[in-house]
């Protein structure tokens, strides 16, 4: 029987070995997808492909409009779910409904930046149905491509909540309704009522009701932040409607108010002039001489 034979890598193997890109080695970037999202036709000059980038962390949602340059990616506009408390949504900043609000905020912000917010108001009342922006007579809608990164694009994923928010906000993003929450695979169509329920946080409200009945103690702990803010299951839809209206009223980014840094005391020694250094040296020499004279007097007293 032949045993395990270790593959011998020759000197030529190491000499010709080429490492992959750093972000591929770290598992952060899908370069196969990126090259298709950034490469532009060579007969189009200074016309970048804009990407609608959505990323999730444990406590935040980031949505950005990005375009690629040789020097690196440039972020044209960004919106974060931690901005939503300013619009009245203080809890549940990472769910499907919050993702919708973040996408809507980014869409209104970038259109205002480009002066298109009056021409393209988008879908003002979120019904859950699919929406495509219609081109106006003068200027075309702002077009971007969805960049999900390494997120698994399952049906009902939060990234498609952000996509729906951006579409209703007035952006032109190529898409299909097959991945929105509420799409029924058997019937091959989107159930707009289910999708509307997710947009307005109805799935969270249902969970609140069921947990309050079945496990009251767990409900008090799980939804403690909701209870502190006085948010209940029945008022969820009205809350999100107010948030959507507030976003449309003022999508601009608020400047953060930071305290001025405290002035620290400096402990650097002051640089002395030549005269000061000379005077200091004389003082030290006099002190040494006086101490040496005192020692001599003590020795004479001891001898006596």
Curated annotation (Swiss-Prot):
InterPro entries: Rbsml_uL18_euk, Ribosomal_uL18_C_euk. Coiled coil: none annotated. The keyword Kinase does not apply. Residues 285-304 are annotated as: Disordered. Residues 294-304 have a biased composition (Acidic residues). Keywords: Cytoplasm, Nucleus, Ribonucleoprotein, Ribosomal protein, RNA-binding, rRNA-binding. It is found in: Cytoplasm; Nucleus. GO terms for molecular function: 5S rRNA binding; structural constituent of ribosome. One of its GO terms (cellular component) is cytosolic large ribosomal subunit. One of its GO terms (biological process) is translation. Component of the ribosome, a large ribonucleoprotein complex responsible for the synthesis of proteins in the cell. The small ribosomal subunit (SSU) binds messenger RNAs (mRNAs) and translates the encoded message by selecting cognate aminoacyl-transfer RNA (tRNA) molecules. The large subunit (LSU) contains the ribosomal catalytic site termed the peptidyl transferase center (PTC), which catalyzes the formation of peptide bonds, thereby polymerizing the amino acids delivered by tRNAs into a polypeptide chain. Component of the large ribosomal subunit (LSU). Belongs to the universal ribosomal protein uL18 family. This is Large ribosomal subunit protein uL18. The gene is RPL5A.
């Amino acid at each position: 029987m032949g045993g395990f034979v270790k593959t011998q890598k020759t000197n030529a193997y190491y000499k010709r070995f080429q490492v992959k890109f750093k972000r591929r080695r770290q598992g952060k970037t899908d370069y196969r997808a990126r090259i298709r999202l950034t490469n532009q036709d060579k007969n189009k000059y200074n016309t970048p492909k804009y990407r609608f980038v959505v990323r999730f962390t444990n406590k935040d949602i980031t949505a950005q409009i990005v375009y690629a340059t040789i020097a690196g990616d440039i972020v044209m506009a960004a919106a974060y779910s931690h901005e939503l408390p300013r619009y009245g949504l203080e809890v549940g900043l990472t769910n499907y409904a919050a993702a919708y609000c973040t996408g809507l905020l980014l869409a209104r912000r970038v259109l205002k930046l480009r002066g298109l917010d009056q021409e393209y108001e988008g879908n003002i009342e979120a019904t859950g149905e699919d929406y495509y922006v219609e081109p106006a007579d003068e200027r075309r809608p702002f077009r971007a491509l969805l960049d999900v990164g390494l997120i698994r694009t399952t049906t009902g994923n939060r990234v498609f909540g952000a996509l729906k928010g951006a579409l209703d906000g007035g952006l032109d993003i190529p898409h299909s309704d097959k991945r929105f929450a509420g799409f029924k695979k058997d019937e091959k169509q989107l159930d707009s009522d289910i999708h509307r329920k997710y947009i307005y946080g109805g799935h969270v409200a249902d969970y609140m009701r069921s947990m309050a009945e079945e496990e009251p103690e767990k409900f008090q702990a799980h939804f403690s932040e909701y209870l502190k803010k006085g948010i209940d299951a029945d008022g969820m839809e009205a809350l999100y409607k107010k948030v959507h209206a507030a976003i449309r009223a003022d999508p601009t980014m608020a400047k953060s108010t930071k305290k001025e840094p405290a002035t620290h005391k400096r402990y650097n020694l002051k640089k002395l002039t030549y005269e000061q250094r000379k005077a200091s040296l004389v003082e030290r020499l006099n002190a040494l001489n006086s101490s040496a004279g005192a020692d001599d007097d003590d020795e004479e007293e001891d001898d006596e």
